[in-house]
């Protein structure tokens, strides 16, 4: 039986919304400042760093998200937007340009 694979690509704005929502729900402290950009890096999984605008003479602040944080944020984002994700499927986060995507692989082989 064939396997099913889906790819969901998130815009930079969707990634930002996912990370901020996740941070608020998990009590991760975020600065009260304007977001400048999000850096996405592939190192032992996909990490994301929200970089904030400099506020006067202060250095730019940033908040890092681990690969598990990024995956959880995207799954939560899909759940709150009613984007279906199969519970038992393997989910892998990949970097795509200035944002991320999620590959969902559904193994339809039954153990006989």
Q: What is each of the regions a protein language model found here?
A:
Residues 1-112:
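Intrinsically disordered, low-complexity linear regions
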């Amino acid at each position: 039986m064939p396997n099913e694979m889906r790819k969901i690509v998130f815009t930079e704005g969707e990634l930002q919304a996912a990370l901020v929502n996740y941070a608020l729900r998990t009590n991760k402290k975020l600065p009260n400042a304007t977001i400048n950009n999000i850096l996405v890096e592939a190192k032992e999984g996909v990490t994301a760093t929200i970089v904030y605008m400099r506020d006067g003479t202060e250095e730019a602040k940033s908040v890092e998200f681990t690969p598990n944080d990024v995956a959880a944020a995207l799954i939560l984002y899909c759940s709150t937007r009613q984007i279906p994700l199969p519970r038992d499927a393997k989910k892998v986060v990949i970097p795509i340009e200035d944002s991320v995507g999620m590959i969902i692989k559904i193994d339809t082989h039954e153990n006989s």
